[in-house]
């Protein structure tokens, strides 16, 4: 049974069309990073991220009620809604000149919650598949090498601990996705990988490279991630009977 919304809900083509536009805007933002003033770029990037997250949350909420309360839509709506709130708080603090206090902070819990809730949506929407335990262990070890190295170099602090949590949650999301046939759904798979990459780079930027402007490319990557994820949920998977 496709995970699209039935005829009485939001037309699938409208939802996917909106997020194809967001994806195109994300691509356009990449070269804009070299042209626009850093503050202008940051504002444009964050407004688009907020818009994509908020519209995604609304689309998933309506889809939840219009599709017989399928649970994966609720998990996805929660993920996008919490992320939008967290990013709004992040940008307000940066706008007020409080960039130094946004990492680590409670705001990070919203970004991490996105990964937890998205993993929950995958568990409901996608059929479970067997993954070689060595692959899962390899992913975990590979992704935790960097934060562990940071622990060894800088010690255990609030910042290094938060960095570890970002990498751990990213590894967990990828492993859970792979164990629920995520590779068979290229839009969802690509969106998930982009989000994980963005939010492994994010703590590294905050801890090690706060002055490097080109790392603001995280913004377009997140917009692309959201776009692919929404398109994937409305086009690709077949929900489990229990959903």
Regions found by a protein language model. Give the residues of each.
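Polytopic alpha-helical membrane-helix bundles and their juxtamembrane interface segments
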Residues: 2-243
